[in-house]
């Protein structure tokens, strides 16, 4: 897992060069946007259970067969596993947002996820839909457009952070499908 600083150092070291130029400017911007980044992560984690439960509910509303006998969310145990997986995915998305780097998401969450879901018979289209609902909710909390906010968000334009979290959710969807 690399954070924004480690990534710059590793890249500079690989080139046998000092950290400078555009890398240094990118780090300055990363630091300047630090409070927005922390507030964005806080917005996600403070609303995580709502984000995940809404995503799973939305997925089920669109595919009621999931809760019918034989469906992948039928029985409390399977529903709990679905909610747990959503929480884990969202947690790693928040880690990636905090670090400013997707490697923690890729290495510790997405690596082998599709194969696991296939082996368990989890319908990928429903999982992708749940992730897209989580993406929309996370972006709404970051951009302060969510209707049920629990906390205030940072002042200023957070569209870059919203785009960043959206890209992490897109990575999850791509890894599952």
UniProtKB/Swiss-Prot annotation:
The record's account of how the chain is modified after translation: Contains two covalently linked phycoerythrobilin chromophores and one covalently linked phycourobilin chromophore.
Look up the record and report any one GO term of the cellular component aspect. Answer: chloroplast thylakoid membrane
The cross-references to InterPro entries, in alphabetical order and at most eight, read:
Globin-like_sf, Phycobilisome_asu/bsu, Phycobilisome_asu/bsu_sf
Which GO BP terms apply?
photosynthesis
Subcellular location(s) of the protein: Plastid, Chloroplast thylakoid membrane
* UniProt keyword annotation of Transport present: yes
> Quaternary state and partners of this protein?
Heterodimer of an alpha and a beta chain.
User: What's the stated role of this polypeptide?
Assistant: Light-harvesting photosynthetic bile pigment-protein from the phycobiliprotein complex.
The protein's name is: R-phycoerythrin beta chain
What organism, scientifically named, is this protein from?
A: Pyropia tenera
The gene coding this protein: cpeB
